[in-house]
Amino acid sequence: MPVQDDERERELVRMFNLDWDPAHQRAGVDAVLDIDIDDHSYRLEVEVKSSTGTTVSTARDVGMDHIQKWRRKLFVIGFYSKEARRPELQHCLCLTPTDMEPWIASIEEKILIDFKLARLASRRLVLKDLFEVCGKKDTYSVEDAKRLHKQQWTAEEYAAAQDTMIGTKRWISQKKMLEILQLRSKYIAERGATLNNPHVTKAHLDTFVGTDRVVKGPNWAAGVRKIATDFVRSNPDHAAIMLIS
């Protein structure tokens, strides 16, 4: 993320009193918002975005993982002036998962067919294909698996794939190695099915102009919390809502 974008998004987090993760280590979560409603505490994951234009950038290589995550997030978007030295915040939008769904669904529609093809094609790989790619062996080593699937698995996952014992040593069976080959094929195909930085469109964002989704100062945090609270009350079973206590 460019330094300027990161600084603006940190500013938004402070204004809206969000819990910011500077390393984005919560599985790609920018921040979280905790709210109390009727003696219960709830948590919403927040996607924090900023823009100096009329659209909003998202991410590189957007695939189905992004789609699934976005459907469980509150979007807080700050729109800034285009001044080179110090862009000033003009206005903000706070959009719920249901607000974002039409745009998210439009992105899903663009990539879904390719992701289905990736899944179906990988399932058709058989042992003959494994032998052609990795050589014909009775069993395979972790090193063989790493050459195939590279850094897509952790050391623990590679160790767990050793499903066969020969003497005192563990190996990977042909069946398990074929599964790894299928996973690798699916991963490669899915990489080609992603979209590069699809923008949240002006047409979608304009539908919220003049509504209560526009957050104004000076009580920025209160505005976001009201939108979040109304969302939880209206959609108590939504997957985005996490009950803390």
Segments the model singles out, each with a brief description of its role:
Residues 1-43, 50-245:
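Nucleic-acid endonuclease domains
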